[in-house]
Design a protein with these regions (language model features):
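Membrane-embedded alpha-helical core segments of multi-pass
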Residues: 24-28, 53, 57, 128-140, ...
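Helix-boundary and loop/linker segments of multi-pass membrane transporters
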Residues: 5-10, 35-36, 78-82, 182-190, ...
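Select transmembrane alpha-helical segments in multipass membrane proteins
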Residues: 8-19, 83-96, 125-129, 187-201
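Acidic-residue sensor for enzyme active/binding pockets
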Residues: 27, 63, 97, 148, ...
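Short amphipathic alpha-helical coupling elements at transmembrane boundaries
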Residues: 66, 73-80, 115, 146-149, ...
C-alpha cells in the first residue's frame, strides 16, 4: 500500500509568513469589540489570559508537529492517540475553524475597501478577495506562501507606522477611565466582562496553529517549524 505525501517546498521564512499572516488580521479588526464588553483594563486582563493559554497550546502543538509532521494536524495527532473517532472529532473541529475564518476575514477586507471606495459593494469585494486567495492556493503552496510573506511584511510595517503615529498622543489616564466594563472599580461586572471578551481576545491568535499544519510541506519540519 503506497502512502501519498505532499512535496516539501516551504522554508523557515515561508512558515513565519504563514504563522504571522494567519493572525495579523486580528490586530486590524475583531479584537476591538472586547473594549466594549470588558473595558480597556478588563480586556487587557483577558488578553493576558488568552496569551498564556495560546503560548502553552503552541508549544505543545509544535512538539506534536515535529513528532508527527502531517498536514492533518489535530486530526493526525488525535487519531494516533484516540483512534479514528477521536481523529474525526478533532478534524471536524479544526475544519469548522478554518472554513469560517476566511469568509470573516474576506468580509473585513470588503468593509475596509468600502471605507476607501464608498461605491464598492463590500460583499462583492469580499467574494473577490476570497476568489483571489483561493486561486493562489490552487496554483501552489509555494506561490501562496510567498505572496502571504510579502503581504505579511507590509502589514507588519503598517502596524509599526500606525503605532509610531499614535504613540505621542497616548494618554494612560484616558486609557484607564471606566476601564473595568464601564466602571472605575473592579467588581463582579468586570469579571463577567473579562470572560465575555475572551472570543475577541482570541482574534489576536486565531489560526496561528496553521503554520504547524503545514509541516508536511515544510523542508526539515523538525527545525523550520520551531524557528518560525
Amino acid at each position: 500500500m503506497t502512502t501519498t505525501t505532499l512535496k516539501p517546498t516551504l522554508g523557515t521564512l515561508h512558515l513565519w509568513g504563514i504563522a504571522v499572516g494567519l493572525v495579523i488580521s486580528g490586530e486590524y479588526f475583531g479584537w476591538s469589540y472586547g473594549w466594549g464588553v470588558a473595558g480597556t483594563l478588563g480586556f487587557l486582563v483577558t488578553t493576558l489570559m488568552v496569551a498564556a493559554m495560546y503560548s502553552c497550546f503552541i508549544f505543545s502543538f509544535t512538539e506534536l508537529t515535529t513528532a508527527i509532521p502531517h498536514a492533518g494536524g489535530p486530526f493526525a495527532y488525535s487519531r494516533r492517540a484516540f483512534g479514528p473517532a477521536g481523529g474525526m472529532i478533532a478534524g471536524m473541529a479544526t475544519l469548522i475553524e478554518f472554513v469560517f475564518a476566511p469568509p470573516a476575514i474576506a468580509m473585513a477586507i470588503g468593509a475596509y475597501l468600502n471605507v476607501q471606495f464608498p461605491g464598492l459593494d463590500p460583499k462583492l469585494a469580499a467574494v473577490g478577495a476570497y476568489l483571489i486567495f483561493m486561486t493562489l492556493n490552487i496554483l501552489g503552496v509555494s506561490i501562496a506562501a510567498t505572496f502571504e510573506l510579502v503581504v505579511t511584511v507590509l502589514a507588519v510595517v503598517e502596524l509599526l507606522v500606525f503605532m509610531g503615529v499614535v504613540a505621542p498622543g497616548f494618554s494612560f489616564s484616558n486609557f484607564v477611565i471606566d476601564g473595568w466594563a464601564g466602571s472605575n472599580v473592579f467588581g463582579l461586572p468586570a469579571i463577567a466582562g473579562i470572560f465575555a471578551a475572551i472570543p475577541f481576545a482570541i482574534w489576536f491568535f486565531l489560526a496561528i496553529e496553521g503554520a504547524a499544519m503545514a509541516a508536511e510541506e515544510a523542508k526539515d519540519p523538525k527545525r523550520t517549524i520551531p524557528r518560525a
